Structure formats: C-alpha cells, structure tokens
Amino acid sequence: MAFVLSLRMALVLVSYCPGGSLGCYLSRRPTLDVRENLRLLDRMNRLSPHSCQQDRKDFGLPQEMVEGDQLQKDQALSVLYEMLQQRFNLFHTEHSCAAWNTTLLEQLRTGLHQQLEDLDTCRGPVMGEKDSELGKMDPIVTVKKYFQGIYDYLQEKGYSDCAWEIVRVEMMRALTSSTTLQKRLKKTGGDLNSP
C-alpha cells in the first residue's frame, strides 16, 4: 500500500515538474516574464522612434511560424526556444553593451536566460527539414535567417543609436508575436491544429 501511494505521489510530482508536461513552460509565469521583458525593452528606449524613421526596415518576421497554424507542438516549442536564444544572443553582444543602460540590459538578459532554461526543460528534439510542415524550409533555419538579417542591418548601420532603436522596436514586436504562439500552445494543450 505504501509503495502504491509513493508511486502515485511520484507520478503527481512528475506531472508538475519541469519536463513532466507541456504545462511546465506554458504556465502563468512565462506570461509574466514576457511582460517584464516587454517592460524592460520599453524602458530601454533612448530615442523617439519617429526620429529614426529614415532607418526603418522590415526584417521579415516569419509570421506563418509565430501564428502557429503550420507547426506541430515540438516544432512550435523549438521555434519559441530559437527565437528566445537568438534574442538573448543579440542582447549579449559587445555592441549591445555600448548601446543600452547596463542595468536594464542585465535585467533583460537575466529574464531571457531564465525563460530559456524554463523552455529547455519542456521542448523535445529540434525538428529537422524533413519533419517541417512549412514545406522545404526548416522553421529553425527561417528564424536564424531572420536574426541574421537583424545582425546584418546593425552592422550596415554601424551599430548606430537609431539602428539599435529600430531593432529594439522589432524585438518588442517579435516578443509579442512569440507570446501569441505560446498562448495558442497553452490554450490547445499543444495541439496547434485544433480551433
């Protein structure tokens, strides 16, 4: 009898611990993390976006992925993870240190790192091209190309204050889009093909 109770308790704990269920990442906490990251990005604003109109650029955020209609659960989690990883890398460059208030930047990095750790416990293996529902394009490659375009833009603009402001606004947009995919995953229990 004690063994059966211990086994039941272990199963209950596994279902609530990281890696034990989809809910390990898609709980209320990540929504708070996203809000905090958006708040930090907003506070990092040093220039009026209107003063940088001439530097605006469409980076081609892959909407078909962040909307989630064409992704399976594992792919969606991998896309969320890759977008977080790339965002973390972007704000962890030497050039980003020169562009932002170091206290706010460090808080943002810490928040992104915590989200990466939380999501890493829940995602499955990275999906490859042959598993992709987006045709011949691997979703992870698409995310990497999107961020490479951002790095190229920053370099082309000499890491100017306006270039960083445009990228800051783009990261807020991308973070909001990622939240849409995350909410959809949570709502559908990971089945993105359900209504």
From Swiss-Prot:
Under what name is this protein listed?
Interferon tau
* Endpoints of the signal sequence: 1-23
Keywords (A to Z) from UniProt? Antiviral defense, Cytokine, Disulfide bond, Glycoprotein, Hormone, Pregnancy, Secreted, Signal
Disulfide bonds, which pairs?
Answer: 24-122, 52-162
According to its UniProt entry, one GO biological process term is: female pregnancy
Any idea which GO molecular function terms this record carries?
cytokine activity; cytokine receptor binding; hormone activity
Q: Which cell locations does it reside in?
A: Secreted
One GO term describing the cellular component: extracellular space
SMART domains tied to this protein: IFabd
The record's section on InterPro entries has: 4_helix_cytokine-like_core, Interferon_alpha/beta/delta
Q: What else is known?
A: IFN-tau genes are intronless. They evolved from IFN-omega genes in the ruminantia suborder and have continued to duplicate independently in different lineages of the ruminantia. They code for proteins very similar in sequence but with different biological potency and pattern of expression.
Found, by tissue, as follows:
Constitutively and exclusively expressed in the mononuclear cells of the extraembryonic trophectoderm.
Carbohydrate attachment residues? 101
Q: Taxonomically, which superkingdom?
A: Eukaryota
State the encoding gene: IFNT
Q: Which family does it belong to?
A: Belongs to the alpha/beta interferon family. IFN-alphaII subfamily.
Coiled-coil portions: none
What is this protein's function?
Answer: Paracrine hormone primarily responsible for maternal recognition of pregnancy. Interacts with endometrial receptors, probably type I interferon receptors, and blocks estrogen receptor expression, preventing the estrogen-induced increase in oxytocin receptor expression in the endometrium. This results in the suppression of the pulsatile endometrial release of the luteolytic hormone prostaglandin F2-alpha, hindering the regression of the corpus luteum (luteolysis) and therefore a return to ovarian cyclicity.
